Amino acid sequence: MLRTEHNDTLTFITQPDHGRLAGMLAAHWGNASFTAAGHYGNPAHADRLRGEVLLGIAEHDNGWWEWEADPSVNTETGLPMGLGEVLQDQQAGMDRWHIGTARFPTHPYASLLISWHAYWLYAIRVVDQPDARFTHPLFWKGAPEQLYPGALDLPKEFMSGLAVTQKRLEQNILDDECGASWLGDDVIKPNIRLLQLCDGLSLALCSKLIPATSGITNGLGSD
């Protein structure tokens, strides 16, 4: 739940709805000057790949479906917990990612993108010198421990499990006639980065979570 106070008004936006906005942004990404989603590199059947990429971006937070249907409540305020409150429970967050990466078994490429999205959210704390190209906009100004607090043992174990999931998903993709061309670094890495970027843009429009590059972070599309 993205809970934002703005102009004396409380706004609540569910994680799945924010995800769909990210998918809409991705669907409109690209023009004559830069590449559309799914068309990076030289993939076979790029339009079909585009559908997988858009699904992965739009449903990157699908693991929240069950929680959002019956959200936890802050006992002091009586309001649904915001994202920062909910993420204090590391194990529950990882359980949601397990659900999210398994939701669409007939769409392994979309699921693979979701798994890489999860990987890079945790890598900012766990991996020594993580690749800055995949750093989520949430962390462009640092302080990942605010959203992902606690010891590192659980995240490390989770990321090891993600690696196993990714190998399985990659094999499922390779079973498709287009699979090999879809997994090349020049194809999949830009799609992962696009997910990170569209997620960040959607969060900036829906909340105050993304820090402004300068001045005060306003949220709700005002930055």
What is each stretch, according to the model?
Residues 1-223:
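Metal-dependent phosphohydrolase cores
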